[in-house]
Amino acid sequence: MIGKLSGRVDSSYDDYVIIDVSGVGYRVFASAKTLSKLSEGESYKLFIETHVREDHINLYGFLSLEEKSFFNLLQSVNGIGTRMALSILSTLTPTDIQIAINNEDKNIFKAISGVGAKLAERIVRELSDKVAKISSSSAAIKDSLNIKGITPVASSEVIKALINMGFSRFEAQNAVQEIITKNPEISIDELIRTALKNRNSNF
């Protein structure tokens, strides 16, 4: 499965770009907000969500782990697939979504093309607890780690990623805290690499 692509934007279209990676072109679908930040001929790093079906493989790209996380979160709602999730993220940022759900503001979602009253109600109802957990977890992590350059939701994703790579939760949180204390503006990618490097050097 493809988790990340680093390459040059060869061409762009209404809902996807072709990313050239060492001469191989990958079609990557993305939200309008992400596509607006990608310029042809420039190189970018995209976090990838790979969807495999019997007749095709689709790649969905994101400039942040936070957007990728909400892409998957939205699809947990009955009636929302990849296309609708991207449509919502084309209009609303992850922070917008969190605020709307916390405020039970269905009208924010109803204003999006393809989202009717019933779907807007399901989004608020089905994601209420999940977003509340993200918000409380992110706030706790932000307070304990004093994060400056990385958003709270993204930091939570980093810790989850490290746990999936074999860290205990305690090890992951301590590793992130130590690294960010030394370099508050470190990128997410570099943060993960440094944590893995430090852990391997201790064995």
From Swiss-Prot:
SUPFAM superfamilies, sorted: DNA helicase RuvA subunit, C-terminal domain, Nucleic acid-binding proteins, RuvA domain 2-like
Any GO MF annotation of the entry: four-way junction DNA binding
Gene3D superfamilies: 5' to 3' exonuclease, C-terminal subdomain (1.10.150.20), DNA helicase RuvA subunit, C-terminal domain (1.10.8.10), Nucleic acid-binding proteins (2.40.50.140)
Function description: The RuvA-RuvB-RuvC complex processes Holliday junction (HJ) DNA during genetic recombination and DNA repair, while the RuvA-RuvB complex plays an important role in the rescue of blocked DNA replication forks via replication fork reversal (RFR). RuvA specifically binds to HJ cruciform DNA, conferring on it an open structure. The RuvB hexamer acts as an ATP-dependent pump, pulling dsDNA into and through the RuvAB complex. HJ branch migration allows RuvC to scan DNA until it finds its consensus sequence, where it cleaves and resolves the cruciform DNA.
Region (Flexible linker): 143-149
Stored HAMAP family: DNA_HJ_migration_RuvA
NCBIfam families named in the record: ruvA
Subunit structure, interactors included: Homotetramer. Forms an RuvA(8)-RuvB(12)-Holliday junction (HJ) complex. HJ DNA is sandwiched between 2 RuvA tetramers; dsDNA enters through RuvA and exits via RuvB. An RuvB hexamer assembles on each DNA strand where it exits the tetramer. Each RuvB hexamer is contacted by two RuvA subunits (via domain III) on 2 adjacent RuvB subunits; this complex drives branch migration. In the full resolvosome a probable DNA-RuvA(4)-RuvB(12)-RuvC(2) complex forms which resolves the HJ.
GO cellular-component term (any): cytoplasm
Chain spans, region Domain III: 150-203
InterPro entries xref list: DNA_helicase_Holl-junc_RuvA_I, Hlx-hairpin-Hlx_DNA-bd_motif, NA-bd_OB-fold, RuvA, RuvA_2-like, RuvA_C, RuvA_C_sf
Subcellular location: Cytoplasm
Keywords: Cytoplasm, DNA damage, DNA recombination, DNA repair, DNA-binding
Lineage of the species this protein comes from: Bacteria, Pseudomonadati, Pseudomonadota, Alphaproteobacteria, Rickettsiales
Domain topic, free-text comment: Has three domains with a flexible linker between the domains II and III and assumes an 'L' shape. Domain III is highly mobile and contacts RuvB.
Pfam families membership: HHH_5, RuvA_C, RuvA_N
Organism: Rickettsia bellii (strain RML369-C)
UniProt protein name: Holliday junction branch migration complex subunit RuvA
Stretches for region Domain I: 1-63
Family named by the database record: Belongs to the RuvA family.
An example Gene Ontology biological process: DNA repair
